[in-house]
Amino acid sequence: RAGTKTAYSFGDSEKKLNDYAWFIDNADFKYQKIGKKKPNPWGLHDMHGNVAEWTMDIFSKEGYDPKSLDNPWSKGRDLYPRVARGGSWNDFPDSLRSTARLPSAKSWKQQDPQLPKSIWYLTDAQWLGFRIVRPLKVPSAEMMESIWNTGVTHDTLE
């Protein structure tokens, strides 16, 4: 949310959305080169629209635990559904709101030719990507272990 409490990082009105996001009204039915729209207050581009970002969060209809809203992470061991955020070039403005979340689906990867299926092969979700991030401070070994060794298993041949 880039430190904001509004619907979008630039305010509550959709009127400025064209300045900050690629979405169904302006993207010409495809993702666009990054960095062409205005950044959020933290200087990050394309946080609304263009491609939705697949996160490590487990999807829950209830949302995040109110006790962990400072730095929320809904950790889980299941591969599906995870959370996609930010909306995409193929979405309407409501899906680009800072709080909007979309549950992932196994069908996003159905054309993956690899066995076992890759957790990152997404030819059926061309509106989805991920953002590489790093913390400002190197996490402890215990924290790294909890992040990268979640116990999630790969897809099976179902």
Residues covered by each model-derived region:
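Surface-exposed recognition segments
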Residues: 4-13, 27-30, 47-157
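Catalytic cores of peptidoglycan-degrading enzymes
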Residues: 33-35
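His/acidic/aromatic-lined binding-pocket segments of jelly-roll/cupin-type domains
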Residues: 42-45
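C-type cytochrome heme c attachment motif
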Residues: 19-21, 50
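Short, surface-exposed glycine/acidic/tryptophan-bearing loops
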Residues: 14-18
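Short, small/polar residue-rich loop motifs at catalytic or cofactor-binding pockets
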Residues: 37-40
